[in-house]
């Protein structure tokens, strides 16, 4: 058999087992662990290429062949780094393996026929669409920003640029939940809305769950007292929905121990652990030692840089409706911003003690930068802490699997939607992001939503080819009209589905049910389930995990930044 040299092979079909690929301009390298394609039987589309009738394309009908195949993709997910073809049917992933024509090719598991469309992924990286579970729905324009960064699912609350939504991720009450569910039908992205959980009596919380809320949010700005926490969790346990909490920064109704006692070992998603977004000052970070708490942090403090602290005071004043002329408001804001705990946040993510990363969109966070800042943090930690156990030169797979899980599978597990989204696995919605390695984590090439491209880098529509400038992200056919509703999903509670919310509101989108939220523990957080014994010095704010002082320096330069955003 004539063999291609590695350079020519990689240029034609992409890298294979044992090859390493650099991620953007970081110091992170991914190494391919397995190749499902077969040497000499690879399929590729184009003039003079393999996917032609009677060659790599068979004559099967629609029932036998896939609707869409991504060829020779490098798949990066929490479960591994492989090279494979990806088959999609009816908007869902149906195959990860070897595509082609089974009549003449060996080992074919994904059938290509006359009804099959192709996305050439040779040399490209495919990841699951990101999941942001800390979204303030302040304006609908966020959706395009999120999509063009690689996000395909948003969970949070809000009703637009109201004072309440600027500060909290709550869509309060039956009327607003109904209107936001109807609005979501027009948005080409998966969405779930969290209702307001700050109530010491259950009736209004139950109403919101019946109205279609995917879960509830307890926030200090509405009240995060022991009574509201206990009531909200009681309701959540009865209806199998998740509770997210932003705890009491001022310690007015109790300290961290008071909140932990009110939680009573029940499952809860804790926001802002740590960062500078709020929560019991100064030791909310200790909550990541508990098995019943699923901890996340937000992107404005990631990674810790020389500018992180300075930018936060003004952000805090605006988002939480504070007055810069009132000393008590200044003191409130400053109590949240601590260099020591912000630095510890980076390290705890690298240890796998913090399980998720989200945005806090337009409310002290940036909806288009969650993926970007996740990989900047991973890069910073590799430089400052070295390779993780199991990694070596040109192989950071352990660290990469840890960090990608923070914005894909773990948020999905936390909010009971992992049966639908969160990973590149058979049976799940085909929410996939295609990246050129040099732009990985920064600017995706195209975003597939429910099996159809919804957003892509695109050149001048009047040009003779797709690539001439100006080149920027544009919404594609999958984001329009009924196609959008057939490829996006609205997530609601089981009880709201049972009482007929979908029919009553005339929702047209795919419907996903949040389920199995209440028995999840931190042990279920994939690649991110460390539960260290935490200590925080109340005077110096020094943070220790299992007795080790968590200290890292702020960086003055980060990758994936200016060289990618000159234009």
Curated annotation (Swiss-Prot):
Q: How is it modified after translation?
A: Carboxylation allows a single lysine to coordinate two nickel ions.
Task: Keyword check for Magnesium, yes or no.
Answer: no
What molecular function does GO assign, one term? urease activity
Annotated catalysed reactions = urea + 2 H2O + H(+) = hydrogencarbonate + 2 NH4(+)
Report the domain of life of the source organism: Bacteria
Which EC main class describes this enzyme?
hydrolase
Q: Which key words are in the record? A: Cytoplasm, Hydrolase, Metal-binding, Nickel
- Where does the record say this protein resides? Cytoplasm
Positions contributing to Ni(2+) 1 binding: 134, 136, 217, 360
Its main localization is: cytoplasm
Residue ranges of domain Urease in the record: 129-567
| Family stated for the protein in its record | Belongs to the metallo-dependent hydrolases superfamily. Urease alpha subunit family.
Q: What is this protein called?
A: Urease subunit alpha
User: What is the organism field in this record?
Assistant: Blochmanniella floridana
State the taxonomy lineage: Bacteria, Pseudomonadati, Pseudomonadota, Gammaproteobacteria, Enterobacterales
